[in-house]
Each structure stands twice: as C-alpha cells, then as structure tokens.
Design a protein with these regions (language model features):
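Flexible "cap/lid" loop of the alpha/beta hydrolase fold
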Residues: 108-113, 117-150
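Active-site loop/oxyanion-hole signature of alpha/beta-hydrolase fold enzymes
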Residues: 54-98, 249
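Conserved serine/cysteine hydrolase catalytic core
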Residues: 176-234, 240
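Conserved alpha/beta-hydrolase catalytic His-Asp/Glu region
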Residues: 132-134, 138, 145-203
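Conserved HGGG/HGGXW glycine-rich cap/lid loop of the alpha/beta-hydrolase fold
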Residues: 11-67
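Catalytic active-site module of serine/aspartate enzymes centered on a nucleophile-bearing elbow/loop
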Residues: 227-258
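Gly/Ala-rich beta-loop-alpha elbow adjacent to hydrolase catalytic centers
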Residues: 99, 103, 107
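N-terminal cap/lid segment of alpha/beta-hydrolase-fold proteins
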Residues: 1-12
C-alpha cells in the first residue's frame, strides 16, 4: 500500500501498487461509487493479458482505504485533482487509466484537466450523462434523491437493502459525506459535460459496455470522435467481475503497445 497527501489539510489518497516493467506505461485503475479499486480490479491487473505493468489500484478520496474528509466537496473535478496529486507524488506520467462507472467519469475529467498524466483511457461502462434522481433506487439515483441532511441523518441506512451484499461490502467503508456528495455531483454532471470532454480528448479512448444493454446513446458521435465502443458479452455493469476473461482481453487490445 502507498499513499500521498492530496489536500492542503492533509487528507491522503491510498492505493495498492503492483510492480512492473518501468519501461512500460503505468496503469491506473479507478473504481466506481461506493467501491474500492483492489476488490474490483486486482484479478484483472494480475491477469496474464494485463500483467507486467506497474499498476496503481487507487481508492478515490472518501472511499476504500483512502481518507474520508468531511470538509471536501467531492465534485468530479475535486476527485480528479486529488487523483492527479497522488499520481504526481507517485511520479506517474502518460498513464493508461482504466475507470469503472463513476471512476470512468473521474478519469475523463483527469485527462481533460491534467493531460500530461493520461496517455490512454479505457472506460468501463462509465457514466457520461447526468442521472435522473429516483427515491429507492440503488447508487447515484437513489442517493441524490435525498438532501444531504436527510442522507446523513439516516437515509444512508436504506442503502444496504438497495445495493445488495456485494456492493455493500465496499460501500460501507465510504465516508457518508463522500458518498452523498459524489453521487449528487455525478447526477448533476459537469460543465463542460463529461461526454463533451471525452469527445474532445486527443488520446486513444475505448469504451467497454455490456452487450445485453440498450444501445449506448450517442455511439455514432463517439465513434466519429475516435472513441472505440466495444460490447462485452455475458456481463452486467461490473464487467471486470462478471466476465473477467473478456474484460482482460478487451482491455489488453485497447492498450496494446506498438
């Protein structure tokens, strides 16, 4: 485990680091809302198709093994800047960044705001658009339907039933302010929009999606902007857990070095 101070007040991001060939691109794995990088990505990072690179399995501020400051805003921009500070401390440049769900949105903002840190992007069913809020739904939609006061006063108790035991295993580790503010800012989106940031990036970008899902909105526009959209069979939202072999092979193809 490694760590770096990422705020003036002293909050620290922590990550699990796997060693690899220093001549090859470093890989950075970013988890989704209420998750943690190692439980979601460790097997993939060690898969024969992806192993051999220095790999940082980073827990976003407020989640997993990272600190949970209650005075942090937890916007997508704030998350991206905190990750950037950690990568600078780790002496990472031009990394291959793999981001799942909200972590994919953070990865896009990271690439837009700190372009020297990101060489290629793999987005794993990442959220590109604002999310409608609906009471009782799991994840971003249900959390953001509360006010912060409601959520902190007891609304968070509903999450255990709504998200199920697997997601709850890591969600219970999150700071409650971090969970609420991250979800709310993800629901609202950014300015410029995440999708617009993605299409404007000048780096190789791949978007992995579950094959059984409805067609990804704006697929043609993404393709015209150079974003490769790849459908993965036999999986739901957690592609790397549901079909680890197909995920590893698709990610390896996206990150194949010339």
């Amino acid at each position: 485990m490694r760590d770096a101070q990422v705020t003036p007040e002293g909050a620290r991001i922590r990550w699990v680091e796997l060693p690899g060939d220093p001549r090859r691109a470093t890989r950075v794995y970013l988890h989704g809302l209420g998750a943690s990088a190692a439980p979601y990505f460790a097997a993939s990072a060690a898969h024969p198709a992806l192993a051999g690179h220095r790999s940082l399995l980073v827990d976003l501020l407020g989640f997993g093994i990272s600190d949970r400051p209650a005075d942090f805003a937890y916007t997508l921009e704030d998350h991206a800047d905190a990750v950037a500070a950690a990568l600078e401390a780790a002496e990472v440049q031009a990394a291959d960044v793999i981001g799942h769900s909200m972590g994919g949105a953070v990865a896009i903002v990271l690439a837009a705001r700190h372009p020297h840190l990101v060489g290629r992007l793999v987005l794993v069913d990442a959220t590109l658009d604002p999310v409608p809020v609906v009471h009782g739904q799991p994840g971003v939609s249900g959390i953001a339907a509360h006010t912060e006061e409601e959520f902190l006063a007891g609304g968070w108790h509903q999450l255990r039933e709504n998200v199920g035991p697997h997601w709850w295993a890591t969600m219970r580790l999150a700071g409650r302010e971090a969970l609420y503010r991250s979800a709310t800012h993800r629901a609202l989106g950014t300015e410029p929009a995440i999708r617009d940031m993605l299409t404007a990036l000048p780096i190789p970008r791949t978007y992995l999606r579950p094959e059984a899902d409805q067609p990804l909105p704006g697929t043609r526009e993404l393709a015209e902007a150079g974003v490769e959209v790849v459908s993965i069979p036999d999986c739901e939202h957690n592609i790397m857990l549901d079909n680890p072999e197909a995920f590893a092979q698709a990610t390896a193809r996206a990150l194949r070095e010339a």
